Design a protein with these regions (language model features):
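A domain-level signal for the structural core that forms small-molecule/cofactor-binding pockets
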Residues: 2-16, 39-223
Length: 223
């Protein structure tokens, strides 16, 4: 097995997917939806060929070598079809309603791809917000904002913050609370190999950050 060749292939795959949230030095950079980037499927195919060659072409049949790169590129194109979208755009249609109490959408299923190993992480998201001046969105839009934010190589921590920030950007609510619980295949299949372990992250904005009682009520509603 040629790990250096596999690493070169992985770099090509990531370059084909394009920038998704970090610069070389680890500093946060402009997300791809603000850069207008496009996915380069041919470069992804080239990277997959390198990975397969690094694994060992002698172990793989001709059909795999000929067609798997194309299939993997198409899979990533499907996984990351929302990557060029701003999550806040999922909340573009705003309604006016005389309601300023908590709105809760819980147990929103999602999957995303961990940017460290390009393996899935799967879980559920809970979204809570308190409208300001009656600005609300349709229930399905809360699920959609999760899907758009998840539809790119991600870290769970960043995903949680991006969902919360999208609601703040579009609705300017009194408060937002997002909680995500997910299991990561990079912990299940490799490394520590701990199937069943889950990670929980939260993002808290506005009233929920300042008001302990409101925060406790929100967490109780999504428990």
């Amino acid at each position: 097995m040629d790990e250096e060749r596999m690493e070169r292939g992985a770099r090509d795959i990531l370059s084909g997917v394009r920038d998704h949230g970090r610069e070389e030095d680890g500093a946060r950079c402009t997300p791809s939806y603000a850069q207008g980037g496009i996915m380069d499927e041919k470069r992804i195919e080239r990277g997959v060929r390198e990975v397969l060659a690094g694994i060992g072409e002698g172990c793989l049949n001709a059909e795999v070598l000929a067609n798997t790169p194309r299939r993997v590129a198409a899979m990533y194109a499907e996984f990351f079809e929302a990557m060029e979208g701003d999550p806040a755009d999922a909340l573009a249609v705003v309604y006016q309603e005389a309601y300023e109490e908590m709105i809760v959408m819980k147990d929103i299923p999602f999957f995303s791809i961990c940017e460290h190993h390009l393996l899935p992480f799967v879980g559920k998201a809970d979204v809570v917000y308190v409208p300001k001046e009656g600005r609300i969105v349709g229930a399905s839009k809360l699920a959609r904002v999760v899907d758009v934010a998840a539809g790119r190589p991600q870290l769970q921590e960043r995903l949680t913050s991006q969902i919360a920030d999208a609601l703040v950007k579009r609705l300017d609510p009194h408060g937002v609370l997002v909680r995500i619980e997910a299991s990561h295949l990079c912990m299940t299949l490799r490394g520590v190999k701990k199937p069943g372990a889950t990670m929980v992250t939260s993002a808290i904005r506005g009233r929920f950050y300042k008001d302990e009682a409101a925060r406790a009520e929100a967490f109780a509603l999504i428990a």
